[in-house]
Amino acid sequence: MPVYVGSSWLILAVVVIALVGPGIAADRPDLGALAYGVGALYAVGLLVAVLVHEAAHAVVARGVGHRVHAVVADIWGGHTTYDPSRGTPGSAAAIAVVGPLSNLVLGLLAWGVHPFAPEGVPSGLLGAFAFVNVLLAAFNLLPGLPLDGGQLVEAAVWRLTGSRPRGRVVAGWCGRAVVVVVVVWAIGLPLLSGARPDLFRVVWTVLICAFLWQGATAAIAAGQSLGVLARLDPARVIRPARAVSERAVLPDVDPQAAHGVPVVVDALGRPLALLSAAAMDGVPAELRERTPVSAVMARQPSEWVVPLEGDPEEDLIALVRTFQDTRASHLAVTRGGVLAGVVSVHELGAALDEIQGRPPRP
């Protein structure tokens, strides 16, 4: 599981140092320039809190069977990328809640040790570490996407309605509502009370809320797209296929046979490639008897095989995501480990366009 600290995180570190460094220098003039080194330790503490949060997401995601791609820390904090296909409301909720819970545990541990820390820098660092972890836990539990609390809202609506797309849309709108509340609290209330919010507070509120609004909007769009997928039966776009051994020679294969698209498989029955009539027709007649299908097959990406689990919505999501990840023109689908058919990206796109009332693509 790769862990990345993006270069943009350095911007966040500089901001933290610029914020806390002057205060430390004022309280501890004896430190001199080292006060900013202590500020750097504050930034490292924040990085540790973020990485523990994201690692908790990753560990639980892997534990419930998802493939985890990476853990990333950046200027916005961090994120964990994983394939959420085949999830359930329960697994989605578990993955979401464990991040804030990990921060809460860290915060409580730091708070418990804090009274025993030496006065001065160690005590200040522990207190700050406890505070930032509790703050991260509380902020991430706000009930709207793209925050973890929004994932909990999505899981709850998904569980109640049986519709993952509806859960995503509702959680996205909740995310927009959270943005409005944060803006009112951070900027609106001070203005209404006659106070003037400082520039730093305004700038960071705007930046954070812009990020949250963008994430909420993307969630709504994704939910609507998932809703379209839910209206399509995968059987409509799956063409029958038949297995052809990679050891076969061309005379053994009729690519125009009515009983399925020829798919080359290995000795264990795993789909490897497609055969086309054009490729076979290009082989001279005098060579056909001894030309193996492996010489003319169109080998596909290793991830081109999609196992169908029997849930139409999840199967469609898996197909679309695999097309996006592999950029393949065709995917092989299996049921119970046995070749079941082939899906064309063009035919899938045409079926989705028809559902949405769009004109056929050229």
Question: Where are the language model's segments positioned?
Answer:
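Hydrophobic transmembrane alpha-helices and their immediate loop junctions
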Residues: 1-330, 334-362
